[in-house]
């Protein structure tokens, strides 16, 4: 085998190894650090907004599930975290509008409008909670996103648990597998740069 072949083989092994690392980390990711069933806040992790300023199905599912949890009495308020992504619309504002349309009073909504990734979702939400003296949160997001979110929140000084937002429409096997694969790659990226969580940096 020539040097090019060895390089290709080594690169393939490295990529597969990193993917396996991410997959194992997702399987072992924590889902909570507390037995609490009632919390000071529900943190809704942002998802992209469409080009017309409306929630995407993923974002709508997260907000809808958070509204259900609010109505069940899990927490008295929602922290909606997400800044501007690929267009001019702020995720937190769109989520707040969606929550109000579903009957949540504006007084129960706390938008966090700066975060551009999941690390910042956690860090900036924690800063809001610390300012208000809130100490516990349920973290709502899509099921495929929650393992990475759990790894991130496990490094924050906060009592928390994750809660999955089921999709509003059934997902195809291809869509589900694609989402898991993308999250595995993002988990690897996070594991490489995990210490940045401690400094609230992207």
Enumerate the language-model features and the residues they cover:
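Short, intrinsically disordered low-complexity segments
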Residues: 3-5, 61, 188, 194
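Enrichment for repetitive, rod-forming helical segments
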Residues: 11-13, 69, 155, 193-196
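A transmembrane-helix-recognition feature enriched in membrane-embedded lipid enzymes
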Residues: 173-199
